[in-house]
Amino acid sequence: MLRISSSLLLASLLVAVTSASASENYSPYADVDHPTNVYWGDTHVHSSWSPDAGGSGNEKLTPIDAFRFAKGEPIVAHNGQTVRLRRPLDFLLVSDHSEYLGLYPMLEEGYPALLATETGQRWKQLVEEGRRSRVGGEFAASLSSGRDLVGDRSFVPHVWKQVVANAERMNEPGIFTAFIGYEWTSMPGTANLHRNVLFRDGADLTRELVPFSAVESQDPEALWAFLADYEARTGGRVLAIPHNSNMSAGRMFETTRFDGSPQTPDYAERRMRFERVVEATQIKGDSEATTATSPDDEFADFENWDAYAGMGVIGPHEDWMYGGEYVRPALGRGLELRQALGVNPFAFGLIGSTDAHTSLATADDVDFWGKFSSNEPYAGRDQDPFAQLEMPEDATFDFSVAARELPDQLYTASLVSSGYAAVWAHENTRASLFDAMARRETYATTGPRMVVRFFGGWGYEAEDATRPDLARVGYEGGVPMGGELGAGPEGLSPRFLISALRDPEGANLDRAQIVKQWLDPESSAVLERIYDVAVSDGRTIDGDGRARKVVGSSVDVKRARYTNTIGEDALITWWADPDFDAATPAVYYVRVLEIPTPRWTTYDAVKFETKRPQNVPASVQQRAYTSPIWYTPGG
C-alpha cells in the first residue's frame, strides 16, 4: 500500500492552491479592460480669435480663458460679472475658425503681411473705430461664397503655432484634456456644412501644419484629402465632426457628393474614416428628429432651427431638405446606401457640444451665457438679434442689428442651452478620448449629465438588468453603443441592456426609448418605430410598446422652479426586439428624456423681472441620445 505523509499532502495542496491563484485572480476587477468612466466635454467652443466671435462682443476672452473656464476656474465676462461652471468639464476643443484664424490679435499686433493688404488696412481702421461688428459681418458674409477677402493669409500659420502651444499648456493627462483643432467653415450659399477638426496628437505632429480652410475649398472631400495627407505624413489621427446639419438646407446628409454626382463606395469609406461622430445638438438648435420625417414622434421637433434654408434668411425651407438635415433620417439613409454601395456613409455616433462663441462652454438653463458675448445675461436679451453683426451691403443674407424685422429663429430667445459630449473612455487623455470617439462609444446630451449605457447582443437575459455589474455583463455579452451586430442564432432577436441614471444635480427621468429604423423587406423603404422601454412612476407600456400617459410637470413657471416629485432617479431595463426580421438591416439608438424643467428664458424672466417670451416654451424636457447599434444580416 502506498503511504503519503501528512506533511507531503499538505505541501501538495499548497502548491495546488498557489497554482490556481496564479492562474485565476482573486480580484474580479483585475482583468477588467472596458471603459468604466464617462467623461464630459465640449468639442466646439470659439474664443475671441474667431472673426465672428470677436465681431460679436468677445473682445478679450482668449483660448486660454476658454480652457480655464472649462477646468472650473471663475472668469470675468464682458458684462463685468464673474461666471463659473457648476462642475468642471473633463475635456475641451477650442475650435476657432480656420478662415482668418486669430484675425483680431493679428490686426492689433500689426502683423506686416496682413496690413500690407488693402482689406487688412481697412479692417484695422474699423477695429480702431470700434466697428469690429463690421469686420465680423464681412467674414460671415464671405462664407457663403468661400471668397478670400485678404489674399495673404500668412498670419494663419503664425497663429496656429500659438493655438497648439495653448492646448499643450492647458493639457493635463489624466486630469483635463485640451484637444488641438479648429473649425472648417464651409457654407456654400449659406448651407451649413461646417466640420470641427479634432486631432488625437500633440504639438510634435500638429505644430507645423497649416489648417485647411473653406477658402481653399468648400467641398468636404477636399477636407478629407487634407486630413488623409496629414495622417499619411505624420502617422497621426484626426476626426472631422459635422454640426448644425439642421441648417444645411438638406446638404449635410445628401445622398450625392458635393458636386452632385452619385456616391461611391470609396466616398462612403472616406467619409466614415474621418466622420465617426456627429454633433447632434447645440446652441443653434437640435438635429435629432423632426415630425416632418417622424410624424408619430411626439418628442421630435425639440428646439429645432429649420424655419429657413441654411444659415441665412435666403428663402423658405422646403420639405425635401429635412431628410438631409436630421440625424434620424440620415441613419435610415445610411441603411439604404449600404445596400447600394456595400458601405454605410452615415454610420456615425452622436455627441453634443455648445458652439459658444463666448469662450464659455455653458449648457445650463439656469446659467446660460448665450452664443455670442453680445448675448451675455441682461434684461430683455431675448428680444434682441442673437448675432449683432454689421453686414455688408452685398451680403446674400442678413441677421444683423440693422435688420430689425427678423424671423423668430434669429432672435436670442430662440437660442438653446445645449449641449455636451459624453465619452466612455479608459482614461482622460487625448488618445483614450479620441479612440472612444473613433469607435463611437459616445452620446449626446442637451446639457444635463445623465449617465447612460446601451448594449446590444444575443444572449442577454431579463435578469441581467438587475445585475450590479451590468456594464461588465454588457461588454462580455455584446457590443456597446456605437457597435455593430452581425447575424445571431437562428430564431433569436437582438437583446439590449439600457441603463440611465439622472444627473445627480439635475432632474429626474421621464422615460427611456429605443428608436429603431429598418428596411422594408419588400420595398426597401426605411421604416421607423419608437418603443418606450422604461418609464417612471409605474405607468403602463401598452402592447404597441408606447406609454401614452405623460409624466406630468412640477414646473412653477412664475418662480422658475421644479421639484423631483415625479420621475425616477434611474431607468434600467432589458429589451428584446419584438418585430425583428433577421433578413433586414436595422439601426437602434436610445433616447432618454428628463421630466420638464424651466427653459433658460423662464429663468431669465424671473431673474430680471421681465415678460417671458411667448414664442418659446416655458419648460422643456432635456434629453440624451446614444450612438446607435447597427444590425447587418450576415455581417
Predicted feature residues:
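Long, charge-dense tracts
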Residues: 198-200
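Bacterial N-terminal signal peptides
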Residues: 7-17
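Mid-domain alpha/beta scaffold segments of enzyme catalytic cores
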Residues: 124-125, 131-135, 161-165, 177-179
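Acidic, metal/ion-coordinating pockets
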Residues: 211, 222
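Positively charged n-region of N-terminal signal peptides that target proteins for export
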Residues: 1-4
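C-terminal functional module detector
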Residues: 22-63, 67-70, 77-116, 152, ...
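Aromatic- and acidic-residue-enriched carbohydrate-binding clefts of CAZyme catalytic domains
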Residues: 113-147
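Conserved, charged catalytic cores of large soluble enzymes
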Residues: 203, 213-218, 300
